Amino acid sequence: MTGSAATSMSRRRLLQGAVAGASAAAFPWHWQAASAQATPVPAVSNAGWNDLANRLDGRLLREGDPMFAAAMEINATRYAATRPEGIAVCATPRDAATCVSWARETGTPFAVRSGGHSYAGFSNSSGLIINVRDMAGVTVDPAEGTITVAAGVNNADFGDAIEPYAVYVPGGRCPTVGLSGLTLGGGWGFSCRHFGMTCDSLVSTDIAVASGELVTASETENADLFWALRGGAGGNFGVNTSFTYRFVPTHDVTYVSAVWTGGDTAGVVDALLRMQVDAPNELGLRMSVRMKSRTPLSQPAPYVVNVLGVYWGEPEVVRELLDQVEEVQPASRLRIEKMPFASARSELAATTPEGTYQLKSGFVEGVLPPAGLTTLLEGLAAMPGVPSREQESTAAFFCWGGKTKDVAPDATAFVHRSADFLFKTEVLWSPTDDPDLIIANLDWIEEYYAAMGPYLNGGTYQNFPDRSLENWADAYYGANFPRLVETKRAWDPDNLFRFPQSIPVSL
């Protein structure tokens, strides 16, 4: 066990108390939703809120407004118990600046929200939510080779808007994730080995900073801020209102999906990892290893290895690469198909975890040694499982390396440049599940992550924020953290933009 008996008991009491409340929203485990904004909300009068409403081009939603409940919704519902006093639905960049100024004047805590997909609930607040989701617009400039995107655009909006132009900016696969958060935290996608991270394609961004000013950050204008905004994670330096990226042309690509069930799982995983490390940069895969959790009446289930991805080239190359893996064990299912990039994008689309969950991530350099493969598989088999979710224990390996390594770790705030894979594992549950079983699963994921620790490099992906991390600053930002603090102090000296894992103004 990673926690003491006393800690487990306190978790159990928290869970039992939440169950007694019979409210799904009031059921977070020991990282309470209320801690998403620890600053007490000052007593702002209705007149004060009306003042904000009158200054907006958009709309201010308050409790009782028919749109308020829908606007409150976030992906990580374990943090949904925190209810804001107001939600500013920004229509213009000026609205974002107005909200920042008003929050500073009134002392109201706030959070910035675009897609609402913060795994740790950092886009929620008990005060004001500055919501940029309605700021939607995509402008393609073929002559300049750039695309300018408003802050509320998500992956689905973006893909649909640029499809007629046959161009692309490296990005994620979840349709409802906002490009704002994706970019600010680095930005993984299936093409990262070929084109780099999303933040590596960023040319400039407009942002409402703590002073209430709207400024532009680029290599030639406010360069210190631009450095920090490429990997420093969202909500730390201001409210970004637009992003301009360099685009790349698209063409037909090769889509690949494969499944291996049972058999020599360790051998298959090892072969897949080794193949990817040495593969051309044009190949981008996500590999997962799953095992259906046991129940008292079930028999041990076989491991299932899934591979999904794209190759920016011909199918024959993919077949040759996968032949290395099929020498270990033939795939149960295999699909290799050349198709238009837009079709591949649709095939690759998937939602992120939703509801109540806990997620852990880390980076792998090279491949797992035999002991690491054993730990990987034995750990998955040890997961208790939660019946309500028909849970499968899962470990995923996202492609890394390639062009992501071509950028120096200190060239941008995104420090994770030496890895070959991003490792992720997660556990999901329902508020109706037995508290003891939920605790067992949460203890399991901490133990599993600790056991995998010797095979990870110590970093954690800042776009997969994790409130349980003790040394989050080093895990997210590594050697870049002191410079981020310096930039924070220059642009937000009063620490206006703050949340439990926000960049501070001093070390």
PLM features per residue range, with description:
Residues 2-507:
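Soluble FAD-dependent oxygen oxidases
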